[in-house]
Amino acid sequence: MVPPLSAVRGTMEDMTIAEAPPRLAAAADVSLRWYPDGPYSLSRTLGPLLRGNSDPSFCVQGDVIWNAFTTPDGPATIRLASAGGGAAGTPLVDIQAWGPGADAAVKAAPRLLGADDDWQGFDEPAFHSTLPRMVQEARRRALAVRLPASGRMVDQLVPIILEQKVTVIEARRGYRYLVHRYGTPAPRAGMSTPAGLVVAPTAAQWLQVPSWEWHKAGVGPQRSATVMRALRSAVALERLAALPALVAGEKMQVIPGIGAWTAAEVVQRTHGCPDSISVGDYHLAAYVGAALTGRRTDDAGMLKLLEPWRGHRQRVVRMIQSTGFRKPTFGPRMTIQDHRGH
């Protein structure tokens, strides 16, 4: 559920976008200007929502990010332009949208941009002093990062299911194939619409994908069956966006094939959950252990390490990741499997 605009942190105003090409600004169906209440990075905030640099539903052009998606009112194309053009150079984001879902897209945009993400408790001196030095330093350098909340359950769940127990490369390759094959062209924003921008399939469209197309995409029967099971309850699934993140994650796991890892990955993106941890991730536990103690660990060890910061554990992980830290590598890498010719 999208909160009333007046209830969202930061400030907003209807606007005509001076920084955008005049014909583009004039042609927008709905537009808005949002002022974050502090430092802000559009690319670092929305980065976790992209399924790689070739995500068919996104296009990044410098300080501008385009995104095409489905709303309850229909498809929309949204253009998000980051600038420092507010009073005294304060950051702002210019928001424009086109298509039947333009109004819904703009109303949801502040939450998408992280307007509801409150770091006050994390930054409170007594709490901050308990954090490892690398996390403290990372936070100092990443004050502009927010946790985004897309509110779009199906759009996040499908690609995350495809990433279960396979490499990111093969999962994203399959996702791109299916979105291009079964998605729809993004609503046009005049001559400026990025070429090839696609709205990912709706739940109904995903349910029409035949078994041989999943196979051609390199998606095995276990993962495709999980997608189909989940999307047969798409209406109930979308309602989870209105629930608290941890409750939504628990309810999601009632669906066979959706476990703790999938649920955590989803609510991190749909709800901007500051605490959910991707237990069961192939790399995360070893990565966190190496970063915090110099030694690899397992899921139980990772949870024990992060327990002092419960309520903000995902923030801690994001800060570690923002440092560029790399754990020492030992043993074989996970092999990309290609079963499309079998």
Where does each model-flagged region fall?
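HhH-family (HhH-GPD) DNA N-glycosylase catalytic core used in base-excision repair
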Residues: 2-342
